[in-house]
């Protein structure tokens, strides 16, 4: 959801990746990133 919700990039900074990482941290994971529009959390 977070990857498609705010998928924009400004000066090389992708806000959707930050939101995905924050989502993953909130559920107890070690961060994450977007891959093909899907938020993938690290284990």
Swiss-Prot record:
Belongs to the invertebrate defensin family. Type 1 subfamily. One of its GO terms (biological process) is defense response to bacterium. It is found in: Secreted. Its main location: secreted. InterPro entries: Defensin_insect, Defensin_invertebrate/fungal, Scorpion_toxin-like, Scorpion_toxin-like_sf. One of its GO terms (cellular component) is extracellular space. Induction: By bacterial infection. Disulfide bonds join 3-34, 20-39, 24-41. It comes from the Eukaryota. This is Defensin. Antibacterial peptide. Affects Gram-negative bacteria including methicillin-resistant Staphylococcus aureus. Keywords: Antibiotic, Antimicrobial, Defensin, Disulfide bond, Immunity, Innate immunity, Secreted.
């Amino acid at each position: 959801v977070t990857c498609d919700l705010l998928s924009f990039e400004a000066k090389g900074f992708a806000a959707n990746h930050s939101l995905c990482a924050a989502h993953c941290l909130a559920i107890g994971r070690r961060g994450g990133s977007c891959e093909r529009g899907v938020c993938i959390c690290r284990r």
